[in-house]
Regions:
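N-terminal Rossmann-like NAD(P)+-binding domain of SDR-like oxidoreductases, especially those catalyzing
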Residues: 1-147
Length: 147
């Protein structure tokens, strides 16, 4: 039986590349997309319609939608790539950014726990090099100071 991966943020650059990579390795890939009046699925258009690619509506700000997807898919792996990723927006709307980027992680973890998958589901939490600010060394590592 194929492994099942759930990718939040599947329509982003990294999410679309990861979906294709995992599908080529034989995974059954499930991705989350937000309901929106704008169609932002151009990066995954070539994957849609393939038998091992599935889309689900969910929002990182809505714990129930995340819970429903995790309960339905019961993934072996979750790659949490969904985020409010615009630096300026993080300053203009800090509460929204924290809700999506920080509390959203908690929502994913709680969904895994409440669905009884804590011992079987592996989770990858993505982040950004923007956390470091103006860096003096490349690449960054766990000892790189924040500026």
């Amino acid at each position: 039986m194929a492994k099942k991966a759930l990718i939040t943020g599947v329509t982003g650059q990294d999410g679309s590349y990861l979906a294709e990579f995992l599908m080529n390795k034989g995974y059954d890939v499930h991705g989350t997309i937000r309901r929106s009046s704008v169609d932002y699925r151009e990066r995954i258009a070539h994957l849609e319609g393939k038998p091992n690619f599935h889309l689900h509506y969910a929002d990182m700000g809505d714990s129930m939608s995340i819970m429903q997807v995790v309960a339905k898919v019961r993934p072996d792996e979750i790659y949490n790539l969904a985020a409010q990723s615009h630096v300026q927006v993080s300053f203009d709307a800090p509460e929204f950014t924290a809700d999506v980027d920080a509390v959203g992680v908690l929502r994913v973890l709680e969904a895994v726990r409440l669905c009884g998958l804590a011992d079987t589901c592996r989770i990858y939490q993505a982040s950004t090099s923007e956390l470091y600010g103006k860096v003096e060394e490349v690449p960054q590592n766990e000892l790189t100071p924040f500026h």
